[in-house]
UniProtKB/Swiss-Prot annotation:
One of its GO terms (molecular function) is structural constituent of ribosome. One or more lysine residues are methylated. Forms part of the ribosomal stalk which helps the ribosome interact with GTP-bound translation factors. It comes from Mycoplasmopsis pulmonis (strain UAB CTIP) (Mycoplasma pulmonis). Keywords: Methylation, Ribonucleoprotein, Ribosomal protein, RNA-binding, rRNA-binding. GO terms for biological process: translation. Part of the ribosomal stalk of the 50S ribosomal subunit. Interacts with L10 and the large rRNA to form the base of the stalk. L10 forms an elongated spine to which L12 dimers bind in a sequential fashion forming a multimeric L10(L12)X complex. It comes from the Bacteria. This is Large ribosomal subunit protein uL11. Belongs to the universal ribosomal protein uL11 family. One of its GO terms (cellular component) is cytosolic large ribosomal subunit.
Length: 197
C-alpha cells in the first residue's frame, strides 16, 4: 500500500463535542462536515473542556486526526474554580492547589507530555501553575511566596508612584519655562524666621 502524501498538518483546539465548520478548519483543506462529525462523536463524553487536535490532511482530501488531553492551564483553573490565570504571577497569587490535585492533573496530562514519569510531569504542571499565579501546597513555600508577591506588589506601587511624581515634576518644569520663578535659599528662610521671632 502506497503512503499517502501529506499536504498539511494543523494543530487546532475545539470545545469537546462542539466543533463546527469555520475559518480555522477551512485553511486545512479537508471535508469540514465530516471532520466535525467525527470529532464531536469522539469527544462528546469529555464535557465542556477544550480539546487540542492535530489534523493531518492528505493530497486526496482525506484526513486523520489525533486528540490530546485538555491544556494543563484549563485543568488547573478548573481545580481552583477560577476563570483565568494571574496577569502578573509575581505580584498576584490567585489560588492554591493541593498535592493531590497536582498529582491528578499530572497523571491526566501524562500521555501528552514527553515523559513517562508522573513525578516529572508534576514538576511540569507545578511550573505551569506558578506561571499562572497558582501555588501548590506542600510543593511551594506558600507563605513565603505570598510574602514575596506582597513585597513585589508594594515595590511595583512605589515605582509607579515615583514615576508619576517624576512626570508631574517634569510637567511643572515645562510649564514654568520662560516664566519668572521665586527662589528662596535655605539660609534665607532660616534667617527670616529668626527675624520674625
Amino acid at each position: 500500500m502506497a503512503k499517502k502524501e501529506v499536504v498539511k498538518i494543523a494543530k487546532l483546539q475545539f470545545i469537546a463535542g462542539q466543533a463546527k465548520p469555520g475559518p480555522s478548519l477551512a485553511g486545512v483543506g479537508i471535508n469540514m462536515p465530516e471532520f466535525t462529525r467525527q470529532f464531536n462523536e469522539q469527544t462528546r463524553d469529555r464535557g465542556n473542556e477544550p480539546v487540542p487536535v492535530e489534523i493531518t490532511a492528505y493530497k486526496d482530501k482525506s484526513f486523520d486526526f489525533r486528540l490530546f488531553t485538555a491544556p494543563a492551564s484549563f485543568k488547573i483553573l478548573q481545580a481552583i474554580k477560577a476563570k483565568s490565570g494571574s496577569a502578573n504571577s509575581k505580584t498576584n497569587i490567585i489560588g492554591t492547589l493541593t498535592l493531590a490535585q497536582l498529582e491528578e492533573i499530572a497523571k491526566y496530562k501524562l500521555p501528552d507530555l514527553n515523559t513517562d514519569d508522573y513525578k516529572v510531569a508534576m514538576h511540569t504542571i507545578a511550573g505551569t501553575a506558578k506561571n499562572m499565579g497558582v501555588l501548590v501546597e506542600g510543593w511551594d513555600d506558600v507563605k513565603k511566596a505570598k510574602e514575596e508577591a506582597k513585597a513585589a506588589k508594594l515595590a511595583q506601587l512605589k515605582a509607579e508612584a515615583k514615576e508619576a511624581a517624576l512626570k508631574e515634576a517634569e510637567k511643572e518644569l515645562v510649564d514654568s519655562k520662560g516664566k519668572e520663578v521665586e527662589v528662596k535659599l535655605v539660609g534665607e528662610e532660616e534667617q527670616s524666621e529668626s527675624e520674625n521671632n
